[in-house]
Amino acid sequence: MNRQPYGTPPQWWPPRLTPWWIRATRGWRRNMLRRKQRIVEVDFHGVDILRREIDAGHGVLITPNHAVHYDSAALYLAADQVDLPLYFMVAWQVFSMSSTFECWFMQRIGCFSVNREATDRQAMKQAIHILQNEPYPLVIFPEGDVYHTTDEVTPFREGAAALALSAAKRSKREIVAVPCGIKFWYLEDVRSSILETLELLEERLFQRTHPELREQDRIHRLAEAIIALKELDYLGYTNQGRVRQRTGQLVETILQHIEQRHATPISRRGDIPNRVKALRQSVIAKLEANIELPDVDIPPDEQRRLVRDMEDLFFVMQLYSYRGDYLDGQPSLERVAETLDKLEEDILERDLPTVRGRRRAEVRFGTPIPIASGESRTSVADLTMQLQQAVQAQIDAINACRH
């Protein structure tokens, strides 16, 4: 996972969608995807669904899986096929870490910022306005982050469903959610690149290379080493058992420690992202109060502990992002490569993983889901699960067609 700043955003970046600019940059956007990410083929299925829903006067929410950092570019190529600009809800950190021109460009292709660690009323108002009034779809990635586990959709966060239900409550037009699956494949044998990355990772962790082992077994050895190091760091000893079990235990230990420090009730729902979000809000409020309020003076030792808490919460989300069973059985080349992509980001601390060869992308849209008005927690939870299952069905359909 990529490191990024957390706190109160320095500003809000509104969308400045410019349809003629989107049309004018089609070739450039496609060439950038080809040149920087070596995506030489993009296939589309069901993209006419978007045009049909827009022509019917409906508000359209697109909910794709977040396969890679540049999947939004592939999604835009799909929308180009039916001449549809798109709006994107984007984490404010993406804007704050971009150049002035990149921010300008993102706004012109429909991006606007959201603070995911708080209740961002400005972003919510903008999203609801788009769904109720604008003639173009809104894209929200309900997974929230890139987890590099395309074949298994990470549990959706509830924000997209809550926004859709809120918009439908007072909308004069029908609002639908269109599930979307996005997947990337290598078009050539990239095992030499995979082996090179494995050797780099093993060297970083002071492991000997075992070329006689399968790639997934070498990755498992890396995982064993990492979890043992982190157990020593946080617990002072190493546990026994499967990596997945030990990861869950370590996550719970870290979260409970921070929740106790900040007097936050321990959630029993097992919803790790929401627990992390609540703790980040608490820590950020204390750190910013020390800066903004003259009568608040947090001792240096406590400031350092708060900063460490933020680091620990980031580490918790890193652990959460590893399924533990993604390479079981006979994993595909793509699954092995995806897992190495994650390890490159987490261990080698690269902003973007290695592009290992020429690739093909597929973007598939599913049957629209009508959004009924209602904002109860049950409605939000039910719609979230429905959207997640519908997106998983698109990924499964992509895989079924390929084999």
Regions found by a protein language model. Give the residues of each.
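Membrane helical hairpin/interfacial module
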Residues: 90-96, 102-103
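Domain-scale detector for complete catalytic domains at protein termini or as standalone homologs
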Residues: 105-106, 110
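ATP-grasp fold ATP-binding core
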Residues: 138-145
